[in-house]
């Protein structure tokens, strides 16, 4: 009984304080205001300020009462507390930016500071003040000014300036200006930019800051040191809209009077800088012409010398404001991911890199390195030393089958470290009372833990280990933000318990003993009014306080920033008022809780950070109030005190890996070859190995007794020495236990993103060219197919084995996951709309329990929302095209064409629709073999009788025309053809003439502009059984094509010999072909074995398209103009691949050089500024590279062990300086697959200086493709090319900068044969025997408005040619009337009788009157015709009474003189002719015909039109165009006498009299000795 009484008494004693606590109600004071969203606190005071509308209000009693600040005039845009003088200083900025207000006494008085007037209008960014941490009188005022100019948004096309200028945006010019003051703002001086601003720079940036950024700064600098970054930016009007930036980073110590530039950054573009406590960090942009290029990080501790930090990945989208330093001096970089402008979450953090304590080697958070990409957040409470909480939210969004019913779900994982990131654990939920409310077993921490995302970088209010957060509990496989709840921790985040079932805003006070929380949604407790909850026992129990109004909480905060006070501000708003938002500001006061009792010593306990372990060589503890103590600490304005005790012995936790080492999977520091190359350890020794300690003590660690660290011998074999370019090459190796079976880059300049699929069906993504590779989380599904959108370069689609489709539109940074229609996957590719990114067609199988089931058939499903929803579009469709989006002038933009194969039939039909087959369905062809689209054409293969094919072409989707193939004796049935490509108005097609497997070949054809009329370009062009053809157009250059022909095609067709291939090249789009000229000597300086002058017997031959392992490995690159690699040999024909060498050309194929004796793989970088070769089919540890366009080659060892390189690649535009090698190495127990990223960026001294208008500069000159280049396609062209090998080009569309020097006169090379004509051995176009020219009147049917047509001359001008004048081989005949248009034709070419008769009669009357007047006044009056013979010039006997008489007499005398001379001339001529005839008859006795002394090209061209007269069936046979000179010498005895040289030449010459060649150049160059015609391959 006594015991029970004692228990009851004890219970009562404990209960009474709790009852008192429950009875306690905080003091709540409400203030109603308009448009007030931010409240600021002065440190260690009761004063608060806020901006209300455009004025400033202040409270001196922790927010209970407010008053307007009277000393501030005008409209205020924003206010802020001075971060270095938080106790008493605040700044208010005026709307116009010309002045601001400062208080130095917590708002009691305000001083107006007037800024210098620049004479320019201030921008909305206005001005703001930066203060100094040590001197209150030091100010930097940063202002932005913009000129009052209209923004021109016109997007007119380039006018086509000769030098390829890019248009500069005409936008408002804005300028940053910085003003400095050292007298508290009484006077300012401008720190002027040291960059000269030109008229094309719309933006000028000046960013200055004090070198000291904290009161405990470790940087070696004076108090007056100021760092300034000046930038001028201008924009290039190209497809990337890239800004061009020039910059200077300077230091001033005399307030801008003198500026000292940092030498290390003189030739670099400084993107930004950040001054920290111990470091200055500078970011330099890798490419000044691409603001999305990767950046380098430079670190300095003394503001004089900078070192480049090692980055494990490319830094492209850093958040410069989010570069900071932790307590250990480590630099933390937050990397944002680039997003489109339409996305709301643009700029969110995607990766976090943390340096070592020296700031020179960065690495990602370890457990995120091999995870998928996503949003990453790092929370480091400064008052909890060593604590880091990281959250990863992968960018894979999942939607349900219908897309929206269940909302957006995502995966996430959160981990915590209390030892500076050395070890990480899950956020454990230890809450037995609420265990049943979770969907997983909270005792299984690895699979059931707290996941959160919304921590800020630093905790705002210090507490003794008491933290709150919102999140969910699970295994990370499902994360729905709508299911968030609120949790609390009392041990610094290691363990958590549930506080509320809903998410809340929260704030803590009294070092965590008072907590206030308010739900985001007022309806959480089923009543419409808002409420807040508070706890006085560190979250153990909660009490509700009901508010009378429904508000949307904006912020809840402790009025003392150091967390020592017990007063709070709750700021919320309501939208109930029509005139704007109304704010409700609640002041909440807990200072009298527990009957105003203050805690005593026995109310406190020790709380140890990191569970009492050593952190940074120190054990930390905090004295905090016991949870159930009935008191408040009440040490207002005192900072939370942290007690530390140095640890006696140092452990491995106090060390980090030395620069040359990295941690392996077990946590051991092991040597890294790439880091060894970057360091200087091997520069200090001549030995093969050097001892290096793998561990170094963390900078700032306070442990007392260092650990003994043994050195490790590092191999220096193959490590480049300091001072060599090879020293600057950076290689990153990745090893895998699987093979990469597929890879493809996204074709953008934003970054070097690529997607890879391994042999297990797993997807991997890299955004830095393979340097870092991360796995894509497909939720357990095997990836069975990958499709890239050919029209939108950032989009790709991954097909999962369980019916999911994963789509990305940002190069793999994020994925949207949707379910495919409930149909069997057939493996058919997607078909995309060329103008709508989210519209595509998917093909699935219906009734396909078995793929062989007779009911199984394909169905085309349409999506317009990127795959969220699909609708069934057409049954039995196996291939569709969005035809309306492909044509330049479509008949209907919504037209879709589909190939349909019915279940019961083997035939296929082509149908079209303009409403996705809802109501409109039109059958275009009843029976087809297939169809495809290329270059604005759709070509349909239709079966014909006798197993032949016919092709039909359309350019609008409605009208189809049969493609007319040329008649040729070697073409039998049209059984197979391959569309090669379509560009600039013509289709190239290969028509098979021999289809015996292994012996395939055919003819190369080219169409006219509408794709309907084809002519033969070359015979016996090689193809393989799969239809691939040895045909390649050289990228970036007009009209250059390489093909391989079967030289022994007749015997191959007869099955007597195997194929013998020869390589041919054309420089005028197939009109003329030649064999490749071989180099005179090989790569070793030796002559080649074959030395025949005939190219038919000795030329260069290259392996072509049909033998490639990867069809992307082309000879040429669109960005490296004129350059080509190829594997081949010099000889009579092509040898087997293994017996060949590697050849290279820089002039588009005119001349070649052997660069390697064996087959090599090649790749272009930096627009050809860096060339890389690697041996093919043999193990190697080295690559060869050239920076002088192949003139010299250097070898570089990229790995320690030899590997078999499977492929070498880079970005599709070949503009990067980094290459990716895929290799396979033999290891113990098998082989391992490896990738090597080789970065050449640092071997160049600088970036080339480029004028964005395309003008020549010191580093770029215009030059022809080769010294022998003359006219090509009717014009002479020069290309802008780099001249200095020591600089790199970067992201400049260099291939687009060219200029035409002039248009040339037309020559034979500007023409090709017309339809039904063929090119004879002599170079002329002749009509095919037995055929007539194409019916020219057909054009009248295609164009009903025409009234006339012209007959073909046998030639047609090459579409690419711009020649003017000269030879007119395509000159049309006389016009003929179109059928049915005879009347219009006559009207066009006849003249009306009435007007003509009037004019004719009028002229006759005038002539008659004039003649009569002259006769009457000049002849009859002077004696008539009888005296006509007596008149002499100057005769005075004529009658002249006035001026009229004198004029008439002069006319008569002049006429007499003219007629008398004509008579004399006729008489003299008659005599000479008789004399000449006599001599000619004498010579006919000894000669058989006339001869010419010298017939030069000019004379020939003068007669060209005459030679072409007649239009006979041989197309005005010009005899031949063989390789002969244009001047013809004759024998001495044939030289005529002087008289003979005047022999009249009036007859038209016969074909035997025409010269044998037309020169290759134009008329202006005919006298040059090297002006010769191309050789003919059949001579």
From Swiss-Prot:
Cite the SMART domains for this sequence: VPS10
Q: Glycans attached where?
A: 96, 170, 447, 793, 1010, 1303
**Keyword field:** Glycoprotein, Golgi apparatus, Membrane, Protein transport, Receptor, Repeat, Signal, Transmembrane, Transmembrane helix, Transport
Q: Which gene underlies this protein?
A: PEP1
Q: Which domain of life is it from?
A: Eukaryota
Q: Which residues form the signal peptide?
A: 1-21
Q: How would you describe this protein's topology in the membrane?
A: Single-pass type I membrane protein
Q: In which organism is this protein found?
A: Saccharomyces cerevisiae (strain YJM789)
Function statement: Functions as a sorting receptor in the Golgi compartment required for the intracellular sorting and delivery of soluble vacuolar proteins, like carboxypeptidase Y (CPY) and proteinase A. Executes multiple rounds of sorting by cycling between the late Golgi and a prevacuolar endosome-like compartment. Binds the Golgi-modified P2 form of CPY, and this interaction is dependent on the presence of an intact CPY vacuolar protein sorting signal.
Family listed:
Belongs to the VPS10-related sortilin family.
Location of this chain's protein in the cell = Golgi apparatus, trans-Golgi network membrane; Prevacuolar compartment membrane
Q: Where are the BNR repeats?
A: 58-68, 101-111, 181-189, 416-425, 487-497, 533-543, 764-774, 861-871, 1143-1152, 1185-1194
Kindly list the biological process annotations in GO that this record carries.
Golgi to endosome transport; Golgi to vacuole transport; protein targeting to vacuole
**Protein name per UniProt:** Vacuolar protein sorting/targeting protein PEP1
Q: Does the keyword Transport apply?
A: yes
Which segments sit on the Cytoplasmic face? 1415-1579
Q: Name one GO cellular component term.
A: membrane
Renumbered to this chain, region (Disordered) spans 1533-1579
Q: Which residues cross the membrane?
A: 1394-1414
* Lumenal compartment segments: 22-1393
Pfam families documented for this protein: Sortilin-Vps10, Sortilin_C
């Amino acid at each position: 009984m006594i015991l029970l009484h004692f228990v009851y008494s004890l219970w009562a004693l404990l209960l009474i304080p709790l009852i008192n606590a429950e009875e306690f109600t905080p003091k709540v004071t409400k203030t109603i205001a308009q448009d007030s969203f931010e409240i600021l606190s002065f440190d260690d005071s009761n004063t608060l300020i806020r901006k209300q509308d455009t004025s400033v209000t202040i409270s001196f009693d922790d927010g209970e009462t407010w008053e307007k600040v009277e000393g501030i005039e005008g409209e205020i845009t924003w206010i802020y507390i001075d971060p270095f003088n938080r106790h008493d200083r605040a700044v208010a900025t005026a709307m116009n930016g010309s002045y601001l207000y400062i208080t130095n006494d917590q708002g009691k008085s305000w001083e107006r500071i007037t800024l210098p007037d620049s004479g320019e209008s201030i921008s909305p960014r206005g001005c703001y003040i930066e203060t100094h941490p040590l001197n209150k009188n030091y100010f930097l005022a940063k202002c932005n000014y913009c000129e009052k100019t209209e923004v021109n948004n016109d997007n007119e096309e380039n006018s086509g300036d000769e030098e390829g200028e890019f248009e500069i945006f005409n936008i408002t010019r804005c300028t940053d200006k910085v003003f400095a003051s050292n007298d508290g703002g009484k006077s300012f001086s401008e720190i002027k930019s040291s960059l000269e601003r030109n008229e094309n720079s719309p933006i000028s940036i000046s960013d200055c800051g004090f070198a000291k950024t904290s009161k405990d700064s470790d940087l070696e600098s004076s108090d007056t040191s100021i760092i300034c970054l000046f930038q001028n930016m201008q924009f290039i009007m190209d497809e990337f809209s890239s800004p061009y930036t020039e910059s200077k980073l300077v230091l001033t110590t005399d307030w801008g009077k003198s500026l000292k530039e940092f030498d290390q950054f003189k030739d670099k573009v400084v993107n930004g800088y950040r001054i920290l406590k111990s470091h200055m960090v500078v970011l330099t942009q890798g490419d000044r012409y691409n603001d999305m290029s990767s950046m380098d990080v430079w670190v300095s501790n003394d503001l004089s010398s900078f070192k480049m930090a090692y980055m494990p990945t490319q830094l492209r989208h850093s958040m410069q404001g989010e570069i900071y330093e932790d307590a250990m001096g480590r630099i933390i970089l937050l990397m944002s991911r680039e997003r489109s402008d339409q996305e709301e979450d643009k700029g969110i953090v995607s990766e976090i890199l943390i340096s070592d304590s020296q700031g020179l080697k960065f690495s990602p958070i370890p457990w995120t390195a091999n995870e998928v990409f996503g949003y990453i957040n790092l929370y480091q409470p400064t008052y909890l030393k060593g604590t880091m909480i990281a959250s990863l939210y992968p960018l894979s969004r999942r939607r349900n089958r219908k897309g929206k019913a269940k909302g957006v779900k995502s995966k996430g994982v959160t981990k915590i470290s209390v030892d500076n990131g050395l070890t990480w654990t899950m956020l454990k939920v230890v809450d037995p009372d609420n265990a049943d409310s979770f969907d997983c077993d909270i005792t299984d921490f690895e699979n059931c833990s707290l996941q959160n995302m919304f921590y800020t970088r630093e905790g705002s209010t210090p507490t003794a280990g008491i933290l709150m957060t919102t999140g969910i509990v699970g295994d990370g496989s499902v994360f729905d933000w709508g299911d968030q709840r609120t949790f609390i921790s009392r041990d610094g985040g290691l363990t958590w318990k549930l506080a509320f079932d809903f998410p809340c805003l929260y704030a803590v006070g009294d070092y965590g003993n008072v907590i206030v929380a308010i739900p985001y949604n007022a309806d959480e407790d089923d009543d419409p009014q808002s409420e807040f909850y508070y706890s006085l026992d560190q979250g153990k129990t909660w009490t509700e306080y009901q508010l009378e109004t429904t508000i949307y909480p904006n912020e809840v905060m402790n009025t003392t920033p150091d967390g020592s006070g017990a007063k709070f501000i709750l700021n919320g708003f309501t939208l109930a008022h029509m005139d704007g938002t109304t704010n409700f500001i609640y002041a909440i006061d807990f200072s009298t809780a527990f009957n105003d009792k203050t805690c005593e010593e026995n109310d406190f306990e020790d709380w140890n950070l990191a569970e009492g372990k050593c952190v940074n060589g120190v054990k930390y503890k905090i004295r905090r109030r016991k949870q159930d103590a009935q008191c408040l600490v009440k040490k207002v304005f005192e900072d939370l005190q942290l007690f530390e005790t140095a640890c006696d012995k140092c452990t491995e936790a106090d060390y980090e890996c030395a620069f040359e080492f990295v941690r392996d999977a077990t946590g051991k520091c092991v040597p890294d070859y790439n880091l060894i190359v970057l360091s200087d350890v091997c520069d200090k020794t001549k030995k093969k190995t050097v001892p290096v300690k793998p561990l170094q003590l963390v900078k700032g660690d306070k442990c007392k007794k260092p650990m003994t660290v043994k050195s490790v011998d590092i191999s220096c074999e193959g490590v480049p020495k300091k001072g060599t370019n090879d020293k600057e090459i950076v290689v990153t190796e990745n090893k895998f236990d699987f093979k990469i079976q597929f890879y493809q880059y996204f074709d953008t300049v934003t970054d070097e993103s690529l997607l890879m699929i391994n042999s297990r069906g797993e997807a991997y993504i890299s955004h830095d060219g393979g340097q870092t590779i991360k796995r894509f989380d497909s939720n357990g599904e095997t990836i069975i197919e990958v499709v890239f959108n050919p029209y939108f370069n950032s989009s790709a689609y991954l097909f999962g084995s369980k019916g999911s489709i994963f789509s990305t539109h940002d190069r793999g940074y994020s994925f949207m996951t949707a379910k495919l229609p409930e149909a069997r996957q057939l493996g058919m590719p997607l078909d995309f709309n060329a103008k709508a990114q989210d519209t595509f067609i998917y093909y699935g199988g219906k009734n396909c329990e078995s793929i062989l089931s007779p009911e199984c058939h394909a169905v085309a499903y349409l999506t317009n929302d990127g795959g969220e929803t699909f609708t069934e579009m057409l049954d039995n469709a196996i291939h569709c095209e969005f035809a309306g989006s492909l044509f330049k002038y479509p008949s209907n933009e919504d037209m879709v064409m589909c190939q349909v194969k019915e279940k019961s039939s083997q035939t296929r039909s082509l149908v079209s629709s303009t409403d996705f087959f809802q109501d409109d369905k039109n059958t275009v062809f009843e029976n087809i073999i297939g169809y495809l689209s290329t270059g604005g054409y759709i070509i349909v293969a239709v079966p014909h009788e006798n197993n032949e094919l016919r092709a039909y072409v359309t350019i609008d989707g409605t009208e189809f025309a049969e493609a007319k193939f040329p008649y040729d004796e070697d073409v039998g049935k049209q059984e197979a053809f391959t569309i090669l490509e379509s560009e600039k108005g013509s289709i190239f097609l290969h028509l098979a003439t021999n289809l015996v497997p292994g012996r395939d070949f055919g003819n190369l054809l080219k169409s006219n502009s509408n794709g309907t009329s084809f002519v033969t370009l070359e015979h016996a062009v090689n193809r393989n059984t799969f239809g691939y053809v040895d045909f390649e157009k050289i990228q970036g250059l007009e009209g250059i094509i390489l093909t391989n022909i079967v030289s022994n095609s007749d015997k191959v067709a007869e099955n007597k010999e195997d194929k013998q291939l020869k390589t041919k090249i054309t420089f005028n789009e197939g009109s003329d072909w030649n064999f490749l000229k071989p180099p005179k000597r090989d790569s070793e300086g030796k002559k080649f074995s074959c030395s025949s002058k005939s190219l038919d017997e000795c030329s260069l031959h290259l392996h072509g398209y049909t033998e490639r392992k990867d069809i992307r490995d082309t000879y040429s690159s669109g960005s490296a103009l004129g350059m080509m690699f190829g594997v081949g040999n010099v000889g009579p024909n092509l040898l087997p691949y293994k017996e060949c060498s590697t050849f290279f050309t820089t002039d588009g194929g005119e001349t070649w050089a052997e660069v390697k004796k064996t087959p090599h793989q090649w790749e272009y970088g930096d627009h050809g500024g860096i060339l890389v070769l690697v041996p093919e089919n043999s193990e190697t540890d080295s690559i060869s590279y050239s920076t002088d366009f192949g003139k010299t080659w250097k070898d570089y060892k990229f790995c320690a062990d030899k590997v078999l390189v499977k492929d070498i690649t880079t970005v599709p535009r070949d503009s990067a300086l980094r290459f990716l090698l895929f290799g396979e190495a033999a290891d113990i127990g098998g082989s391992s697959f490896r990738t090597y990223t080789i970065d050449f960026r640092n071997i160049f001294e600088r970036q080339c200086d480029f004028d964005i208008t395309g003008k020549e500069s010191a580093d770029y000159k215009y030059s022809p493709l080769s010294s022998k280049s003359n006219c090509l396609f009717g014009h002479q062209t020069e290309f802008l090319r780099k001249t200095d090998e020591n600089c790199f080009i970067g992201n400049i569309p260099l291939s687009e900068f060219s200029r035409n020097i002039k248009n040339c006169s037309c020559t034979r090379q500007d023409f090709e044969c017309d339809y039904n004509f063929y090119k004879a051995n002599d170079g002329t176009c002749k009509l095919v025997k037995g055929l007539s020219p194409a019916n020219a009147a057909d054009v009248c049917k295609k164009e009903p408005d025409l009234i006339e047509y012209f007959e073909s001359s046998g030639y047609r001008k090459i579409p690419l040619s711009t020649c003017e004048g000269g030879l007119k081989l395509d000159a049309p005949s006389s016009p003929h009337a179109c059928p049915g248009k005879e009347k219009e034709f006559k009207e066009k070419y006849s003249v009306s009788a009435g007007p003509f008769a009037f004019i004719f009669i009028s002229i006759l009357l005038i002539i008659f009157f004039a003649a009569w007047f002259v006769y009457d006044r000049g002849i009859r009056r002077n004696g008539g015709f009888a005296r006509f013979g007596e008149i002499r010039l100057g005769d005075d006997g004529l009658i002249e009474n006035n001026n009229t008489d004198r004029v008439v007499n002069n006319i008569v005398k002049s006429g007499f003189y003219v007629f008398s001379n004509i008579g004399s001339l006729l008489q003299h001529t008659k005599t000479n002719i008789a004399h000449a005839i006599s001599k000619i008859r004498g010579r006919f006795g000894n000669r058989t015909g006339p001869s010419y002394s010298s017939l030069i090209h000019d004379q020939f061209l003068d007669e060209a039109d005459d030679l072409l007269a007649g239009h006979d069936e041989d197309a005005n046979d010009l005899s031949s165009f063989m390789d002969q000179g244009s001047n013809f010498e004759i024998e001495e005895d044939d030289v005529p006498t002087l008289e003979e040289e005047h022999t009249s030449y009036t007859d038209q010459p016969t074909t035997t009299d025409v010269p044998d060649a037309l020169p290759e150049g134009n008329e202006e160059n005919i006298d040059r000795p090297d002006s010769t015609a191309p050789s003919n391959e059949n001579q």
